[in-house]
Amino acid sequence: MTFQSLILGPALPEILLAVLGLVLLMVGVFRKTDSTGLVGLLAVYGLLMALAVVGLGAAPETPQLAFGGLFIDDGFARYAKALTLLGAVLTLLLSMVWLKRENEGRFEFPILVLFATIGMMMMISANDLIALYMGLELQSLALYVIAAYQRDNLKSTEAGLKYFVLGALASGLLLYGMSLVYGFAGTTRFDGLAQVAAAEGGISTGLLIGIVFIIAGLAFKVSAVPFHMWAPDVYEGAPTPVTAFFAVAPKIAALTLFARVMMGPFAAYADQWQQVIILISILSMLLGGFAAIVQTNIKRLMAYSSIGHVGYALIGIAAGTTEGVRGVLVYLAIYLFMNVGTFTVILAMRQKGRAVEGINDLAGLSKQHPMMAAAMAVFMFSMAGVPPLAGFFGKFYVFMAAVNSGLFALAVIGVLSSVVAAFYYLRIIKLMYFDEATEPLDALSGTTMKVILIGTAAVVALFFLAPSVVVDGAQAAAEALTFASAR
C-alpha cells in the first residue's frame, strides 16, 4: 500500500467526527460538573459541521478512493451521508430535551450517537466487504448500548439484550456470507468482485449462497422480514428518542448500503438475487401492514410501520435500475422527515408529567392541542401515501421503477399493502379528531421540539411545491452509483 493510496481527503467528515468524539470523551471525563449539555451541544455542532462538509462540497465527478481503496466517496455516498447526518442531528436534539426532562443525563449518550453515526458513514462509503463489516459493527456496538441506556428500566435492558443477541447472530450470517464470497471470488473489493462477475459470465453455487447470507445479514440491519423479530421489542423498550434514532439514521444508512452492495459488486448477478429481494419486500410490506393493525402501543405500531416502509424501499432495489435507486433515495429522504416528526409527537405525549405510549392516549388531541394534532395528521396521511403529501411521491417513484422494470405484480402488491396500512394511520387521525379524551395530554413544551415539529410537518406538507430539490439530487446520486458500478 503506497502513501498515495492512503489519501484521507474523501474521508474528511468521518475523521472530523472521530477526532471530536475522542475530544468529547476527555471533556466528559475531566470536567467536574455534569457535562451532558455541553457534550451534547458540541456533538450537534460537530454533526452539523460534517453535514456542511458533505453537503456544501461538490460531489466528485469520478469516485474518489481512500485507505487503499477500502473507502469510496461519490455522489451517492454524499447524498446518503447528508440524510444520515440530518437524521442524527434532529434525533440528537430531541434526545437532549428528553435527557434533561427525565434527569437521565450522562455525557456518554451523545458520544455514542456520534460514534454510531461514524459507523453509518463508513458503511455508506464502504468499497470492500471488510470495510463494510467494520462500519456495520462500529454502528451496532454503539446502538446496543444506547438501546439499554436506562439501566434501571427492565424494558430498556431487555431491548438492549435482545438487540445484542440477535445482532450477533446477524453479524455471524454476514461474516459467513463474506467468507464464502471471498473463497469463491478471491477478493473482497467491490470493484474486484464486479470484475470477477464480468469475467466468469456465470455464478457458482458457493458464491450464490454467500450472496444470500450477505442479504440475510443486511436484511436484519434494516429489520426486513423474516429478520425483523428484534424491531418491535427494541422500539417499544428503548427510550423514545433512541427509538427515533433507530428508526431514522441506521435505517437510511443500511438501506443505502444494501443498494450499493446489490448494484455494485453483485449487479451482474441481478437475475439471481432479485427474486430474494422481491420475496423479502413482499413479506415486509404485508407483515408491516397487517401486524400494525392490532397494536395498542404507538412505538410498537411504528416498529411495524417501519418494517412496511423498508418493504417499499426494497422495491426500488429489486428493480435493479438507476430509476429504482433514485426511488429508494427519494423515499428515504421523505421517510426521514415523516418519522422524525411522528416521534416528536410521541416524545411530547405526557399526562401529568408522565410519559404515555398508548395509541388511545391520542384521543381528543385536536381539541386540546390543535397544532400537534394537525402535524400528526399530516404525518399519518403522508405515511398512508395520500397525495399531495410527500409520502405519495416516495411510493410513486418506487412503484414506477418496479413497473418500468416489468415487476408489475410487486407494484400491485405494494399498492394493496399501502391500502391495508392506511387503516391504522387513519385510525390515529380518527382518534385525534373524533374521539373524546379520557385524560388530556400535557401541552407541547420547549422551543426545540416545536421547531422540529413545525419544520418537519412543513416539509412533508409542502414537498409537492418543489419536489425537484430532492428528486434531482437523488437522480444524480443514483447515476453516480451506477457509474461507479460500471467502471
From Swiss-Prot:
- Top-level taxon of the source organism: Bacteria
Q: What is this protein called?
A: NADH-quinone oxidoreductase subunit N
Q: How does it assemble?
A: NDH-1 is composed of 14 different subunits. Subunits NuoA, H, J, K, L, M, N constitute the membrane sector of the complex.
Family in the record:
Belongs to the complex I subunit 2 family.
What catalytic activity is recorded?
A: a quinone + NADH + 5 H(+)(in) = a quinol + NAD(+) + 4 H(+)(out)
Which PANTHER family does the record cross-reference, listed alphabetically? Answer: NADH DEHYDROGENASE
> Between which residues do disulfide bridges form?
none
Species in which this protein is naturally found: Rhodospirillum rubrum (strain ATCC 11170 / ATH 1.1.1 / DSM 467 / LMG 4362 / NCIMB 8255 / S1)
**Family matches, as InterPro entries:** NADH-Q_OxRdtase_suN/2, ND/Mrp_TM
Tell me the GO BP annotations in alphabetical order: ATP synthesis coupled electron transport
In which broad location class does this protein mainly occur, judging by the first location in its UniProt entry? membrane
Give GO cellular component annotations, separated by semicolons: plasma membrane
- Tell me which UniProt keywords the record has, alphabetically: Cell inner membrane, Cell membrane, Membrane, NAD, Quinone, Translocase, Transmembrane, Transmembrane helix, Transport, Ubiquinone
**GO molecular function per UniProt:** NADH dehydrogenase (ubiquinone) activity; NADH:ubiquinone reductase (non-electrogenic) activity; quinone binding
Localization recorded for this chain is:
Cell inner membrane
Q: How does it sit in the membrane?
A: Multi-pass membrane protein
- Biological role: NDH-1 shuttles electrons from NADH, via FMN and iron-sulfur (Fe-S) centers, to quinones in the respiratory chain. The immediate electron acceptor for the enzyme in this species is believed to be ubiquinone. Couples the redox reaction to proton translocation (for every two electrons transferred, four hydrogen ions are translocated across the cytoplasmic membrane), and thus conserves the redox energy in a proton gradient.
